[in-house]
């Protein structure tokens, strides 16, 4: 038997209903903030991610699903490992920043070659949010406030903890990088193997090492905050002031750096202690240089207009839906959602009348989910009704047609009664979704 690939999971109907419920709440909050939905390709040119994410990141070095297509000459392509790079590519390609400050969101599968474990899969799903055009700290605070409202709507507000840091500007970060490398070079024999590798490729990622011995070495290491300029400090302080005004609690985590090279200034994560090692549910930050960086790359490759490139500020976040659903199962379980409210059973001799009744009910009561079985025996149809999860079963035979009535069976109590054919058309008589 052919099975799903390791780390790629089917989402079956019972679970899919919970996904739709979660996605509808998140989409509702995004709409309340005026964000617009964009649909992006799941395959992009490999070079896009190498330029945007950074060639020395774990994602680009060892986690991407890449292949070469059949074009002439062949083009290296990659299943998207994250969404921001594609969103920036789309904004640049379609000139969405011309006279506007787009606020966009997208949802869909991402792909990374990682060791599958609970809450982390090779195909996983994210909702991503990107706000373009404002360099001011209120844009950072708005995104964080939005996620705070999402947690409240999902019943998760008390289970989330917000961690903040500032990465400053690129020159400030480079100065800090040199100081950190100098400090750790003398102690590299005490570093874990992964951190030794990162010392020469991406030393800031050592800060979020999970190894206790490495964290002990970092206690006396130079602090990034000491390398920030006045403007970066003022920006970060204003973000904190806005969050305080909004009543959103936070912690400063000086080791929070994020795994992607494009971030600057504010970075943040929402974490929980309910999911073990998979503690981060949502993460994001500011990336003011990425729009211009990708435009500049196009100019170098002869794909742009060769005009001087001015970058545009941007800030965004992404949250993993698998982890969010896991957290909800632990602290705020979503009730099972039956696929059917009313099941219509019709005697084979009057089955066409049953089809007409069910169709009329679907037109008249769009709030109800109405199912029918095929034109088999009444006994076989009732077995299907029992398994459907329906609250009511409507039974139609010749007697009901002659009397212009329906028989209604309460599937929970087993009680059965006769009612007028239009009884279910009145919401006051039955509504499962109050």
UniProtKB/Swiss-Prot annotation:
Annotated SUPFAM superfamilies: Class II aaRS ABD-related (SSF52954), Class II aaRS and biotin synthetases (SSF55681)
GO molecular function: ATP binding; histidine-tRNA ligase activity
GO cellular component: cytoplasm
Keywords from the UniProt entry: Aminoacyl-tRNA synthetase, ATP-binding, Cytoplasm, Ligase, Nucleotide-binding, Protein biosynthesis
EC number per UniProt: 6.1.1.21
Catalytic activity as recorded in UniProt: tRNA(His) + L-histidine + ATP = L-histidyl-tRNA(His) + AMP + diphosphate + H(+)
GO biological process, one term: histidyl-tRNA aminoacylation
EC supergroup of this enzyme: ligase
Subcellular location: Cytoplasm
Protein's UniProt keywords contain Cytoplasm: yes
Transmembrane regions listed in the UniProt entry: none
InterPro entries found in the cross-reference section: aa-tRNA-synth_II, aa-tRNA-synth_II/BPL/LPL, Anticodon-bd, Anticodon-bd_dom_sf, His-tRNA-ligase, HisRS-like_core, HisRS/HisZ
Subunit structure: Homodimer.
HAMAP family: His_tRNA_synth
Similarity comment text for this entry: Belongs to the class-II aminoacyl-tRNA synthetase family.
Protein name: Histidine--tRNA ligase
Lineage: Bacteria, Pseudomonadati, Pseudomonadota, Gammaproteobacteria, Moraxellales
């Amino acid at each position: 038997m052919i099975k799903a690939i390791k780390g790629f999971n089917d989402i079956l109907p019972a679970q899919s209903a919970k996904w739709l419920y979660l996605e509808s709440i998140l989409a509702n909050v995004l709409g309340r903030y005026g964000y617009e939905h964009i649909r992006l390709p799941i395959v992009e040119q490999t070079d896009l991610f190498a330029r945007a994410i950074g060639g020395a990141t774990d994602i680009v070095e060892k986690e991407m699903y890449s292949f070469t297509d059949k074009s002439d000459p062949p083009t290296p392509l990659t299943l998207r490992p994250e969404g921001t790079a594609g969103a920036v590519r789309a904004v640049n390609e379609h000139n969405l920043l011309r006279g506007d400050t787009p606020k966009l969101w997208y949802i869909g599968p991402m792909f990374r070659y990682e060791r599958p474990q609970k809450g982390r899969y090779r195909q996983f799903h994210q909702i991503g949010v990107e706000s373009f055009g404002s360099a001011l700290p209120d844009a950072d605070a708005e995104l964080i406030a939005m996620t705070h409202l999402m947690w409240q709507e999902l019943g998760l507000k008390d289970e989330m903890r917000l961690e903040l840091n500032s990465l400053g500007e690129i020159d400030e970060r480079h100065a800090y990088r040199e100081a950190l490398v100098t400090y750790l070079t003398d102690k590299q024999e005490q570093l874990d193997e992964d951190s030794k590798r990162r010392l020469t490729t991406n030393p800031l990622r050592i800060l979020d090492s999970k190894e206790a011995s490495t964290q002990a070495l970092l206690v006396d290491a130079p602090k990034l905050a000491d390398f920030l300029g006045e403007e970066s400090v003022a920006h970060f302080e204003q973000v904190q002031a806005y969050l305080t005004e909004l009543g959103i609690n936070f912690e400063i985590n000086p080791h929070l750096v994020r795994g992607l090279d494009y971030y600057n200034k504010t970075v943040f994560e929402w974490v929980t202690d309910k999911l073990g090692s998979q503690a981060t549910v949502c993460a994001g930050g500011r990336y003011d240089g990425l729009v211009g960086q990708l435009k500049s790359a196009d100019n170098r490759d002869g794909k742009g207009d060769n005009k001087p490139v001015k970058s545009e500020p941007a800030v965004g976040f992404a949250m993993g839906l698998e982890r969010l659903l896991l957290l909800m199962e632990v602290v705020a379980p979503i009730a099972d959602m039956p696929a059917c409210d009313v099941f219509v059973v019709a005697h084979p001799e009057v089955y066409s009348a049953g089809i007409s009744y069910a169709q009329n009910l679907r037109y008249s009561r769009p709030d109800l989910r109405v199912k029918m079985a095929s034109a088999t025996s009444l006994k076989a149809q009732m077995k299907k009704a029992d398994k459907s999860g329906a609250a009511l079963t409507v039974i139609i035979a010749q007697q009901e047609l002659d009397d212009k009535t329906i028989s209604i069976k309460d599937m929970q109590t087993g009680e059965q009664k006769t009612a007028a054919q239009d009884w279910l058309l009145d919401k006051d008589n039955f509504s499962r979704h109050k």
